[in-house]
Amino acid sequence: MPRYDYSSMGFYTYDCLGWPFTEVPPGGGTVFIDELTLAVSGAAGTATIAAAKMGLKTLAVGGVGEDMMGDWVLERLKSFGVDVSAMQRKPGWKTSSSIVLTRADGSRPALHMAGATKDFFVDESMFDHVTDAKVFHVGGVGLTQAMDKGQNAKVMKAAKDRGAITTVDVFAGSPKDLPAIASVLPYTDYFMPSIEEAQALTGLRDHGDTAKYFLDMGVKACVLTLGGDGAYYHDRDGVKFRVPAFDIVVKCTCGCGDAFNAGYAVGLVKDFDPEMRVRFAQATSALNAMGLGSQAGVVNFDHTLNFMKTQKTRG
């Protein structure tokens, strides 16, 4: 029996978010906003807290700096019951941090400082600890520079060798990001990029062709998040379907894909069938979009399940 339900390794960041952002004031001027909040975010960080909120016993695996932001990230993770024993403090590095300017339509331009995420490194002595989970997730391949040089793939192989279900999300903007991502795909059960990232990597537009590209690289299944168009699932056995998005009023899209990953992990732990997993992941993402900041709108498992069952979807 694994020690954890979910181990989430990769990109952890400190976010300061304001809403609604309308303009940059000229010179040294001031524009007043209605809300300001802080959040642990990042492809691994958002997923970690969202999963913990929904009842998974969760291990955080990443790096923060020796600064106030790092202190806050660790305390915030612990406040949700997350095990931070695999979080590293990186001397000489600042914690990866963002100022997120969220518009009224939910779009969120950001100013980001890439910090300790670039330097954290999981060596072989840590493999048994960090992969001791039913679901092992790597979030932010492409942003974890020290790990992207082959170590992510080694940890993924170790996770597969001990029987974990593996999931991967990425940060990608062009085909040049593909080599770092390609190395982990043979050990990936569920590859879950956004459609924008998948298209940037492959140059393809059709959802089926895009998914097949990654299936041919070794993944068991590809789950493409489509924003307001829902999600597309396609696996090696030929099962494929699209799930529509929920009809909601969007407040902030920060962390929506990462919350989707957490919801999908919950579905794996609960042994949901593929379509229910994707629907539950969509519900988690939708709730995330209804709050300001990553995972703010996610409450608990029962709340997400009820939302999935009762909320209308888009046509």
Predicted regions and their residues:
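Glycine-rich phosphate/adenosyl-contacting loop at the front of the ribokinase-like
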Residues: M1-G63, M68-S79, V249-K251, G315
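Conserved phosphate-binding/catalytic region of the ribokinase-like
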Residues: M1-Y6, G10, G18, F32, ...
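Alpha-helix C-terminal capping segments
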Residues: T48-K57, T102-R103, G267-D271
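A glycine-rich helix N-cap at a beta->alpha junction
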Residues: R76-G92
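Conserved phosphate-binding/catalytic loop of the ribokinase/pfkB sugar-kinase fold
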Residues: R89-K90, V100-Q145
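Conserved beta-alpha-beta core of the PfkB/ribokinase-like small-molecule kinase fold
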Residues: V135-K212, D229-G230
